[in-house]
Amino acid sequence: MLRRTRISEFIWKPYNHKLGIIMKPVVQLERTGCGIASVAAIVGLSYPKAQSIANSLGIFAQDEHLWSEISHVRKLLWHFGIKTGSREIPFRSWEALPDLALLSIKWHLEKGRTYWHWVVFVRENGHGYVLDSKKSLRSNRRTDLGRMKPKWYIQVTDTQLR
């Protein structure tokens, strides 16, 4: 049986938009670790800590299923007690997004399989931005929303970690 990680084991404070805690970007340390980094940003962990926990759950950045399936990211969020919407919602506009969501960008087909890059959308005080874990970016807190082309999103509905 999986044991959920307790809040006392965290290094940083978790995100809670009601308390005005600002989320910090987490840079992925592996070329394909955007899903792990996105969860780390939501939960408030460093990449190495989130990576270690993900690995203990059988989730590895090198696994191609992590790049093209949603279940691994949902499993990691569940482990931390984070609740999400039950389905992927097609992206319509930045204004229509909830205050906190996982977004799929750079969505593409490769050999008949879908792939994307995970990022986190945050709206604080009426202003939206994206936490993008890509290592080569000048800033991992992005406000150039028009340059991104989201395909769909998953709403994060409860960040009250247990």
Question: Could you tell me what each predicted segment is?
Answer:
Residues 2-64, 79-80:
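Active-site nucleophile-adjacent alpha helix/oxyanion-hole segment immediately C-terminal to the catalytic cysteine
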Residues 147-162:
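Charged phosphate-binding loop/patch that engages nucleotide di/tri-phosphates or the phosphate backbone
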